[in-house]
Amino acid sequence: MAIASSSREPRSDAARNQQLLVRAAIAAMHREGTRVPMATIAADAGVGIGTLYRHFPAREDLLNHLTHVSFEQVLVNAQAAAGSAVTATGALWQFIEAAISQRNELVLPLHGGPPSGWPQTSIVREQVHQVIQQIIDRGRADGTIARDVTPYDIIVLGAMLAQPRPADPGWDSTCLRLLATYLAGLGSSTPRD
């Protein structure tokens, strides 16, 4: 429902309520999982349950929306990294570092979120893979990334490092250290080539 196009802009209060609901739903799902009661999400957003159901008539609508907007954000991150003037491994660093910094804003299947049933989301997910493949191809051409590295390898690494860890203040520095180690091992001079 939230993706359906309309010929008119939503009222400002409706748009604000939807943003409040999305932020509250993301936080609640990170805190309680995908089965968090819809009433909890509405209460956390400071709106009535009727407002939630006007925007998202069923739990699946909300979950699909959260997954879709998360993939859209990941695509923006991938495109920004691909367009940067850095090396391929630098672009991958930028891409994964963005996922780490946005970990509490993303609801994705590899983060424990639901897979989306929306065809539009599959298209965005495929676009993410294509952009990451372009970065990998750039690295293959300059010899900084081995031939057998795939977009899925990079995406899984990003998902692992971007897991929400609210009680560990040193997690960001640990993630960046692990990222540096992983990216250093992507080079084509490794024994697996």
Please identify what each model-predicted range represents.
Residues 1-35, 39-44, 61-64:
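Basic, helix-initiating cap at the start of DNA-binding domains
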Residues 1-5, 129-148, 167-193:
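C-terminal peripheral helix-coil segments that are non-catalytic and often amphipathic
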Residues 3, 15, 19, 23, ...:
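Generic detection of well-ordered alpha-helical segments
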Residues 33-34, 54, 146:
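Helix-turn-helix/winged-helix DNA-binding modules
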Residues 46-56:
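Short hydrophobic/aromatic patch on the recognition helix
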Residues 65, 72, 76-105, 120:
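Hydrophobic alpha-helical connector segments
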